[in-house]
Amino acid sequence: MALAPDGRFIYFQMSFFHGFFEFDLERKAIVRRAELPVPDAVKKLPLARYQLNSAHHGITMSGDGGKLCVAGTMSGYAAIVDRKTFQAHVIQVGEKPYWATTSADGRFCYVSVSSEDRVAVISFADEKPVASIRVGDHPQRVRTGKMRMIPAP
């Protein structure tokens, strides 16, 4: 789930749906739905073969709130989506992209590529991958955090 900077809109995914929804907290209603591409091979799969009932799993927002990054788990891609137009730029990242989170500075989307033991780093501005980081076995949920260092007495 991703919350817009103004606190009015939430973006979320649902099992077996290849895309996401925009929910308006003031109107208390879904106001838009984004359908993202589904590869032909995935269209032929029975739903029982979807990893953890997830067509897409993982959504995050750029630091300026202008773009979303969506992990297309069953489709092997991440999509950078313009929040106003819902125009999507699909980036092939590998097998089973499972989660997405935003870098601390808001400039990059980190997508775990669970079947390839790595995290793809995608630039929100350029809508391109800029790095691939090898990590431990089968990464799933990734988070960005900040630590406050307190000097020892």
Task: Spell out what each predicted region is.
Residues 1-153:
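Predominantly soluble domains enriched in secretory-pathway, periplasmic, or organellar proteins
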